[in-house]
Regions:
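Phosphate/pyrophosphate-binding loops at sites that engage ATP/ADP/AMP, CoA/4′-phosphopantetheine
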Residues: 96-109
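Active-site-adjacent loop and "lid" segments of alpha/beta metabolic enzymes
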Residues: 1-19, 25-28, 34-35, 39-99, ...
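Active-site metal-binding loops of divalent metal-dependent hydrolases
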Residues: 116
Length: 193
């Protein structure tokens, strides 16, 4: 089902020269997506959901976003228990990072995502953002996906756009490779101001 939905769209976008990142935890989908024109595989499981993901990405030679993950969304809130969230997330993401490198994923193809909103309560998310320099210090590009997430407040995602822009603006100059947002124009304007 995932492949039926995304592969035809990727093919059409690639024909138009659009840069494409595919969001999947499945190695087979990642392979087909890259063959169809995607250039980045964004794996929210950080390689934990599919044992074939790292070897597949290594063979494909594409960019790979490795996100911190403690399990599927149905039970991730129960797993939001940390002593020191930043140290533990770095430790856990480093384990997956070592596995990716051992499987042959090239260092220059890896992008790290600390997993804002995944197995983290609001305080954890803010702590990660406040200490983002510790992730940047790992020496990999860092992607932050904070857009419209619950920890920003508001009952509806649209009510979180202003806070999304404020967080984006706060990340300027901190060595972040990219932010993943919904309201692109407002975030670009915030970065340029």
């Amino acid at each position: 089902e995932e492949q039926v939905r995304v592969i035809p769209v990727i093919r059409e976008l690639a024909k138009k020269g659009v840069a494409i990142s595919v969001d999947t935890m499945r190695a087979t989908t990642a392979k087909l997506a890259v063959e169809a024109g995607a250039t980045i595989v964004n794996d929210v499981s950080g390689g934990a959901a599919d044992p074939e993901m790292f070897s597949t990405v290594a063979k494909l030679g594409c960019k790979y976003t490795l996100m911190h993950w403690r399990g599927h969304s149905k039970d991730m809130n129960e797993k939001a228990i940390y002593g020191d969230v930043v140290s533990e997330v770095i430790e856990e993401i480093s384990i997956q990072l070592d596995k990716a490198l051992a499987a042959g994923v090239k260092r220059e193809n890896i992008i790290l995502d600390p997993g804002i909103g995944f197995a983290k309560n609001p305080e954890h998310n803010w702590e990660v953002l406040n200490r983002i320099d510790e992730f940047v210090a790992l020496g990999y590009p860092v992607l932050i996906g904070h857009s419209r997430k619950r920890f920003l407040g508001g009952d509806h995602p649209d009510e979180r756009e202003e806070a999304t822009v404020a967080v984006t603006q706060s990340l300027v100059g901190k060595g972040i490779w990219a932010v993943r947002v919904h309201g692109v124009k407002a975030n670009v304007e915030a970065i340029r101001s």
